[in-house]
Amino acid sequence: MSGTAEFPGRIPAPYLEVGSSSFVELLGSVAPELLPGRRPLPPGDMGDAAPHGTTIVALRCNEGVVMAGDRRATQGNMISLRDIQKVFPADAYSLIGIAGTAGLGVEMIRLFQAELEHFEKLEGNALSLHGKANKLANMIRGNLGIAMQGLAVLPLFAGFDTDAPDAASAGRIFSYDVVGGIYEEREYDAIGSGSIFAKSALKKRFQSEVDATEATRLAIEALYDAADDDSATGGPDLTRKLFPTVFTATADGAKRVPDAEIEAVSRAVVAARLENPGG
């Protein structure tokens, strides 16, 4: 750090000021150009200038919540990436998945992770799950300008509510619109270009009493159906051994479902569809 002219190497004053516990607000005051929504862009629609991530699904289960995402990113009518990861742990008990402009989405996830960690370090306690969801809504509002130029990012947020009376009611799912509106979903939700097909699949198959293993299978079934009708969504790729990314958030924390388990479930789903293509 440059410090000041009087005391070279000293921490700059903005870092020592007492403010909020928000890392995003701190970054906005000391280096606003690093925030995605503050970067200058040329006029016009830039939606086809970068790869886009597609379909994410989340559903509640007896132990908490399951979130899954396909691995494809597209740019216009081309497949730009076949193995992108679009679902991540936000912190110890919550998950985030992104659809929309892939690069900005991954950057938003990293910034959101830093925001939650920064708050916990300063306050000594983690935000409530709803507080985390509201933090994410504020970040989306900050990106409204570039979203209007075709570089929108829409996340899906879910987690295990440690304040819930029991595990069966602890799984919560939050969706957003492009202006930062936040909506809690009761049972399941999906975002991205294949979301209408994924939600239709879950509407037929979802039951209120499912464990995490069954919820994982339902999520993969939903992504398979989305890929069947939406060219921007990638289904299980048996040839390349590329399968959906799946995370769970339970009382044990946010964990990735092992790749070997996802491969076994994906192969079982594909084999079943050979017998009954419509599921």
Curated annotation (Swiss-Prot):
Subunit relationships: The 20S proteasome core is composed of 14 alpha and 14 beta subunits that assemble into four stacked heptameric rings, resulting in a barrel-shaped structure. The two inner rings, each composed of seven catalytic beta subunits, are sandwiched by two outer rings, each composed of seven alpha subunits. The catalytic chamber with the active sites is on the inside of the barrel. Has a gated structure, the ends of the cylinder being occluded by the N-termini of the alpha-subunits. Is capped by the proteasome-associated ATPase, ARC.
Keyword annotations of the record: Autocatalytic cleavage, Cytoplasm, Hydrolase, Protease, Proteasome, Threonine protease, Zymogen
Removed propeptide positions: 1-53
Catalytic residue list: 54 (nucleophile)
Reaction(s) the record says it catalyses: Cleavage of peptide bonds with very broad specificity
Activity regulation description: The formation of the proteasomal ATPase ARC-20S proteasome complex, likely via the docking of the C-termini of ARC into the intersubunit pockets in the alpha-rings, may trigger opening of the gate for substrate entry. Interconversion between the open-gate and close-gate conformations leads to a dynamic regulation of the 20S proteasome proteolysis activity.
Family the entry assigns: Belongs to the peptidase T1B family.
GO cellular component, one term: proteasome core complex, beta-subunit complex
Role, per record: Component of the proteasome core, a large protease complex with broad specificity involved in protein degradation.
Associated pathway: Protein degradation; proteasomal Pup-dependent pathway
GO biological process terms held by the UniProt record: modification-dependent protein catabolic process; proteasomal protein catabolic process
Matches recorded under CDD domains: proteasome_protease_HslV (cd01906)
Enzyme class: hydrolase
Coiled coil: none
Main location (coarse class): cytoplasm
Entry-linked InterPro entries: Ntn_hydrolases_N (IPR029055), Proteasome_sua/b (IPR001353), Proteasome_suB-type (IPR023333), PSB_actinobac (IPR022483)
One GO molecular-function entry: threonine-type endopeptidase activity
EC number: 3.4.25.1
Subcellular location: Cytoplasm
Name of the molecule in the record: Proteasome subunit beta
